Curated annotation (Swiss-Prot):
One of its GO terms (cellular component) is cytoplasm. It is found in: Cytoplasm. This is ADP-specific phosphofructokinase. Its EC number is 2.7.1.146. It comes from Thermococcus zilligii. It catalyses: beta-D-fructose 6-phosphate + ADP = beta-D-fructose 1,6-bisphosphate + AMP + H(+).
């Protein structure tokens, strides 16, 4: 079932933009964490944890947020806004791996390695170091304008000298890692990652003016678009531009992609620390999207920005499925989405309206493909061929699977759901993942691509 659906999806052409970066990965151990705590002192770290810095301006901000992430076992991303800290990080850590990062880059390489018919990736900054991190496959293209025409080149042939490179530092942690914060012994409850995401003025999210007139041609050429990276927009820039300017351009990009046909557009949402920016992204872009993907922390952030603070707090505090379902229904209706996809450690969920062309069984198959691809990636660290889906098929569903199904049925009984199609499946959970980076992107890509493939088969695309 999963194999056949992947085969159908591989016949699609997909456009993805905007964010790529270099991921510098550190595999954390208890000794490294202990060294960092000892350098600053447990009291100073604990006090800064209470302050809960929203961005990293100095090393202690980093250590405090890292220890908080390890203590909760939840994946987190915090922006680094002080460029001078590059030297501190590089002197304190040896990077185990450098590879493609950024949602658009990860998604492009994944689709290309799965042998999709055509993958067009766009990022406004394409330095040689970045371009060389794209896989060298004949189905992967980067759009450029030459002689007044749209030309598709391979990314490694289209780089520009002098373009800036964004480096994100990713600290992978394993469940069971132990260290001490003063007298408190902390054992990490879940595997995950802590991302120090560079947020510098030189890196912006936009489509170059010369390429924008050709977005309708790209939209007509592809079956779907996956857009991401809006968390990289700053509220204000020193040259006078601001978030409103870049979000206006982002809205225009979506409308241009959809101009020649009703192109299905998926937005992959990522945590945005600034409530003001989060609200702007939601209200400007979600109503133009057909599909949105996020995790349970991100849906809580979104609901908070929309004014549903009590519900958001319940999701943050209790992680109850019924609260996530209620929040998903609100978001689906208020933003007029076709489909909302929510992924967590233990389950993946689709929420659509009752008139969605796909049946609940078909939606379930889409999620099965998504979790299987993610299990393959977690097992191997990356997916380099479509055959590797077999690895994911051998990964068992997590031990909370039956509990998830039970709570989901209870939630459906409690809430009015007749106007919706609600589907949930337990995740295939790798106990000791090689890497957790890109798992959410893999889930969303597998889900959206298979969703498109089944729509196309029904003549609905």
């Amino acid at each position: 079932m999963v194999r056949e659906l992947l085969e159908k999806a591989r016949g699609l052409s997909i456009y993805t933009a905007y964010n790529t970066n270099v991921d510098a990965i550190v595999y954390l151990n208890g000794e490294t964490v202990q060294r960092l705590i000892d350098e600053f002192g447990a009291d100073a770290v604990r006090k800064r944890m209470e302050d809960y810095p929203r961005e990293i301006n100095e090393p202690l901000d980093f250590v405090a947020r890292l220890v908080h992430a390890l203590k909760t076992g939840k994946p987190m991303a915090v922006p680094l806004v002080n460029e001078e800290l590059h030297t501190w990080f590089d002197s304190h850590f040896r990077y185990d791996v450098e590879r493609m990062g950024g949602q658009a880059g990860i998604i492009a390489n994944l689709l290309s390695n799965l042998d999709f018919r055509e993958v067009i990736v766009y990022t406004p900054h394409l330095a040689k170091r970045q371009a060389e991190m794209f896989v060298r496959k004949p189905n992967l293209f980067y759009p450029v304008v030459e002689g007044g025409r749209l030309v598709l080149k391979h990314p490694w042939e289209a780089y520009r000298e002098g373009d800036p490179v964004k480096v994100n530092r990713i600290f992978e942690f394993r469940a069971g890692t132990a260290f001490k914060l003063g007298d408190e012994r902390i054992v990490v409850p879940f595997s995950g990652r802590f991302i120090v995401s560079a947020r510098f003025e030189s890196i912006r999210i936009y489509t170059e003016p010369g390429l924008r007139p050709f977005l309708p041609e790209i939209g007509e050429r592809v079956d779907g678009a996956i857009l991401s990276g809006y968390q990289g927009i700053n509220l204000r820039y020193s040259d006078g531009k601001d978030a409103n300017y870049y979000l206006r351009k982002a809205k225009e990009d979506i409308m241009l992609l959809k101009r020649e046909k009703d192109l299905k557009v998926h937005l992959e949402f990522a945590s945005i620390q600034s409530r003001e920016l989060r609200k702007k992204v939601i209200y400007n872009l979600f109503p133009l999207a057909d599909s949105v993907g996020m995790d349970e922390a991100e849906i809580a952030y979104v609901l908070s920005a929309l004014g549903y603070d009590e519900l958001a707090d319940r999701i943050f505090t209790y992680n109850r499925i019924e609260d996530t379902v209620l929040g998903g229904k609100i978001l689906l209706d208020e933003m007029n989405l076709d489909v909302l996809q929510i992924h967590t450690i233990y389950y993946i969920m689709y929420i659509t309206h009752a008139d969605n062309p796909l049946s609940e069984e078909e939606l379930r198959r889409s999620l099965e493909l998504a979790t299987t691809l993610a299990a393959s990636r977690a097992s191997l660290g990356d997916i380099t061929s479509p055959d590797q889906i077999e690895i994911g098929l051998r990964v068992p569903y997590n031990e909370r699977g039956e509990y998830v199904k039970l709570r989901f049925e209870e939630a459906k009984r409690k809430l009015r759901t007749k106007e919706y199609k609600l589907v949930i499946i337990p995740t295939r959970l790798v106990q000791n993942p090689v890497s957790t980076v890109g798992l959410g992107d893999t889930i969303s890509t597998g889900a959206f691509a298979s969703y498109l493939a089944m729509l196309k088969e029904k003549g609905e695309l």
